[in-house]
Amino acid sequence: RHTRADLEHWRRCEAMDREYLRRCGAKLDKLTVDAVLVIEEFAAAGPCYVGCSWGKDSVVVAHLASLASPSPPVIWFPAGAVENPDCALVRDAFLARHAIEYREIEASELVWTDGEHDGAQAAFAAASRAVAPRYISGVRAEESSVRERTMLRNGTASATTCRPIGWWTGADVFAYLARHDLPI
């Protein structure tokens, strides 16, 4: 599926990630320690889970959660036929190397595609009923102005949501993935 040009571009990106890591490794060390502490404090306050999509940010948060004590369960809400098939490949690669408590709760395809229902809210409601009303998310302020406002208003954790990488940059995320050889 990937062209030679795609793979060459990916190699160049990985080289930039390694260079960023070389130059900013101490910054990433602090970000990592801080993120694990935020997860631990949030998990200590009551039942929670890591909401995982198997995208790059979710993979980082799942890995950070695996370092936390207590380590909350990781839950994926696959969206049936509309789900990116590569998510399952990333999931399988991650689970083959990391012993975590993991569950899947199938989201109804209708919920994700009918235009009248908010798939994310339906997934959170299902998780609240099945696991816990509180969750750990991989959202980052850099991704949108709405997420930035959420971070400014609530910080890395509110009563129901934890955002341990909320202030990380995309470069931080890719450097973390490179440092820990995490799948994406």
What residues fall within each predicted segment?
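Nucleotide-activated chemistry modules centered on ATP-dependent adenylation/adenylyltransferase
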Residues: 1-184
